[in-house]
């Protein structure tokens, strides 16, 4: 999607990707090999004017090595923090960004100390390699913690208090090389088995106070890293306050709605930021519902029978829980967007949350 956004700007792309025949190879040149292959990294640097990443499992060491030869954005330091939940939590604390109570777990003695600091119910999360709900275990009673840690392979982890949040939001901001910052509207996210299924943009019922909190914490993070590119911050709303859950230093699934519902998509703005070009408009052009396609591809004709639907398929091999594409339903009328979303959900056998009003997810 980055390459598709860059093509009209005259940009050409080379991808480093281990899987042969990846869908990205349709829109650029693919180097097939491991993300830490020194020879391929050297070739990528030689072939590129600048390098970015859209996958958090890229080794930070590879990004740092590339940065010695050509500009890399977002900064490798942000990638390192985004890959480690403990570093992430410590960073939130250092910037006085509210977050859930947590404790480090790295030894048997830490298990006892963690239960003194974090009330149950809590969630044990591996420090690294957690994505779409992986690397987590729910702890309902204190006696379950050791078993949960064994379940995670005794990997370094954090124990985090379960937050009784009202909803999950995402704040997406982009910062250019010259320091220019632009922010998209806050969006509301809904998950299915730990995987993002639905994003509503803008988030229904936003208040100036919520928008101000999101802008302040995003600005603190962007400044902390001297950031370049798109940064997503996943947030919990709790009684009018925002708690930071995690950062994603890359273009983000909850920003895919911008392809059809914003004046400039997150993908184009990410590229503009890295190139030092002026940023595009980030305001929404109406109301958008983004529905992820999981596990099985739909009939394109059925999806596109909805007048405001935009179908984006990724040409990936279907498997359970895999994101195969997404549909954006975008328009100026929140009732029409809601009606078409409900029709799409019925066609795909997707369970949707109940709308705030009988006929609309947004106030009318």
Where are the model-predicted features located?
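Active-site nucleotide/adenylate-binding loops and adjacent lid/helix of ATP-dependent enzymes
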Residues: 81-170, 174-221, 331, 345
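Anion (oxyanion) recognition and catalysis
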Residues: 7, 45, 66-67, 93, ...
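Active-site "cap" helix and flanking loop/linker of ATP-utilizing ligase/carboxylase catalytic domains
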Residues: 212-233, 238-239, 248-296
């Amino acid at each position: 999607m980055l390459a598709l956004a860059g093509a009209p700007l005259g940009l050409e792309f080379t991808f480093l990707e281990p899987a042969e025949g990846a869908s990205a190879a349709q829109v650029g040149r693919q180097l097939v090999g491991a993300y830490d292959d020194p020879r391929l990294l050297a070739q990528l640097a030689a072939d590129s004017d600048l390098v970015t990443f859209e996958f958090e499992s890229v080794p930070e060491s590879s990004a740092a090595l590339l940065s010695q030869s050509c500009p890399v954005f977002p900064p490798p330091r942000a990638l390192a923090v985004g890959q480690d939940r403990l570093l992430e939590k410590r960073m939130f604390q250092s910037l006085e960004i509210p977050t859930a109570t947590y404790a480090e777990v790295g030894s048997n003695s830490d298990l006892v100390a963690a239960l003194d600091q974090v009330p149950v119910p809590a969630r044990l999360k591996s420090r690294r390699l957690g994505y779409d709900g992986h690397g987590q275990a729910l702890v309902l009673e204190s006696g379950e913690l050791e078993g949960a840690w064994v379940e995670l392979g005794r990997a370094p982890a954090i124990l985090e208090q379960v937050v009784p949040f009202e909803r999950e939001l995402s704040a997406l901001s982009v910062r250019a090389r010259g320091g220019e910052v632009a922010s998209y509207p806050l969006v509301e996210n809904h998950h299915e088995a730990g995987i993002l299924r639905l994003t509503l943009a803008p988030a229904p019922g936003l208040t100036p106070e919520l928008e101000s909190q999101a802008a302040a914490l995003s600005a603190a993070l962007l400044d902390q890293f001297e950031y370049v590119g798109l940064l997503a911050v996943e947030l919990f709303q709790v009684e009018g306050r925002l708690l930071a859950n995690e950062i994603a230093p890359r273009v983000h699934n909850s920003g895919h709605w911008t392809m059809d519902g914003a004046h400039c998509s997150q993908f184009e703005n990410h590229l503009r930021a890295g190139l030092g070009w002026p940023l595009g408009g980030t305001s929404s052009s109406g109301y958008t519902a983004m529905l992820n396609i999981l596990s099985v591809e739909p009939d394109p004709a059925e999806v596109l029978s909805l007048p405001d639907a935009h179908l984006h398929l990724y040409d990936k091999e279907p498997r359970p829980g895999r994101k195969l594409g997404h549909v954006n339903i975008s328009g100026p009328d929140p009732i029409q967007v809601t009606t078409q979303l409900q029709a799409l959900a019925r066609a795909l056998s997707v369970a949707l949350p109940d709308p705030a009003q009988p006929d609309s997810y947004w106030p009318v």
